[in-house]
Amino acid sequence: MAPSQLPAIFNPTSQDIEQLLAAQCHLGSKNLQVHMEPYLWKTRPDGINVINIGKTWEKIVLAARIIAAIDNPADICVISARPYGQRAVLKFAAHTGAVAIAGRFTPGNFTNYITRSFKEPRLIIVTDPRTDAQAIKEASYVNIPVIALCDTDSPTEFVDVAIPTNNKGRHSIGLVWWMLAREVLRLRGSIASREAEWDTMVDLYFYRDPEAEENKDAIEEAKAPGADEVGAAAVDQGFAGTGDWEVSGATAGAFTAASNTAAAGGASWDAAEPSDWAATPAAAGQEWAASGATEQW
């Protein structure tokens, strides 16, 4: 890493450098744009251009100082048409008070004052100059400064401050936005000191696929306790739970005994039925005969 041109208070810690390397912020593309040559460290044998992490940190601090110099945070617009940066810009806007445009940038946001989405920001920050080219083009029409996360092959036309980093990976994009938000909060005084840790985890800025999260939840529900015993595992184990079947057999025996008792009860009803019904008509016939004789007399 090249010697830093920043005051000692802005020097990165070893943890910051480790995070940048772990998120692969130093890995660029195989193509190199001429204006990104000052940020190049070296080129690997496989053709990948390696970015100087020291330059990345210097530009993060410079961009944070520019952002902190704007009095009204709502005058800052953060933009990301790339899906990997949409969650990051939304979290950055929530923590710093900026206005986020996540997704497609509507043409005319900065130039057509008739539209409802018309904005007049004092500064815009984009995730990728290539995918956010429309926003940068309109900002150049109305003289809005632009801060951009630039890879080695990113066009730097109309970009005022380029933060050299890998702007194609979900972890690298999230980490740079997280570090930028942390530096802004430190300069504003929201974080007590530079030695104090920010309580917001960097994972909050990482992109998450909604479908993958739903599939993950479904898999966790399928792995509920006891689910394996009635699934394929039970077949592999040869239905080891024969004790349950024996208990069921005992229960079936109880049902058999109950049915035998019911059959015995049916036999007693059959035996009692003819005697009772045979005796009743006879008695009834005698009574009617007696009453008829009485009426005749």
UniProtKB/Swiss-Prot annotation:
Please list the residue ranges that the record marks as compositionally biased, kind Low complexity: 282-297
Pfam families assigned: 40S_SA_C, Ribosomal_S2
Native organism:
Sclerotinia sclerotiorum (strain ATCC 18683 / 1980 / Ss-1) (White mold)
Similarity comment: Belongs to the universal ribosomal protein uS2 family.
GO MF terms here are: structural constituent of ribosome
Instruction: Supply the alphabetized keyword list.
Output: Cytoplasm, Ribonucleoprotein, Ribosomal protein
Region (Disordered): which ranges? 266-297
Q: How does it assemble?
A: Component of the small ribosomal subunit. Mature ribosomes consist of a small (40S) and a large (60S) subunit. The 40S subunit contains about 33 different proteins and 1 molecule of RNA (18S). The 60S subunit contains about 49 different proteins and 3 molecules of RNA (25S, 5.8S and 5S). Interacts with rps21.
GO cellular component terms, alphabetically, are: cytosolic small ribosomal subunit
> Subcellular localization, per the record?
Cytoplasm
* Sections of the chain in a coiled coil: none
Give a yes or no for keyword Cytoplasm in this entry: yes
**Transmembrane domains' residue ranges:** none
Q: What is this protein called?
A: Small ribosomal subunit protein uS2
Q: Name one GO biological process term.
A: ribosomal small subunit assembly
Q: Which InterPro entries match?
A: Ribosomal_uS2, Ribosomal_uS2_C, Ribosomal_uS2_CS, Ribosomal_uS2_euk, Ribosomal_uS2_euk/arc, Ribosomal_uS2_flav_dom_sf
Role of this protein:
Required for the assembly and/or stability of the 40S ribosomal subunit. Required for the processing of the 20S rRNA-precursor to mature 18S rRNA in a late step of the maturation of 40S ribosomal subunits.
